[in-house]
Amino acid sequence: MIFQKIQEFIAEQLSIDKNNIKLESDLKEDLGIDSIDAVGLIIKIEEFFKLEVSDETLQKFKNVKDILEYIQQHVDNYDYLEKK
């Protein structure tokens, strides 16, 4: 469920087909995310998952898997989200 939500947010932010977004997709090289897109994406993630992502952390995200792992580590009720 978390990966699908990330796919949805990226697809919406970049106006691309979510089926082109894979766990290993590089945010810049494969998806073409620039700094403005990244901020928009993170705002969606923060609001949906009720997280705060620092600018330093944002800079560390290289691929979709990095975002997924961060969410899994920081969401309070991860098990509940997976069952939704």
Swiss-Prot record:
This is Acyl carrier protein. GO terms for molecular function: acyl binding; acyl carrier activity. The lineage of its organism: Bacteria, Bacillati, Mycoplasmatota, Mollicutes, Acholeplasmatales. Belongs to the acyl carrier protein (ACP) family. The keyword Repeat does not apply. Residues 1-75 form the Carrier domain. The gene is acpP. Its main location: cytoplasm. The modification O-(pantetheine 4'-phosphoryl)serine is found at S35. It comes from Phytoplasma mali (strain AT).
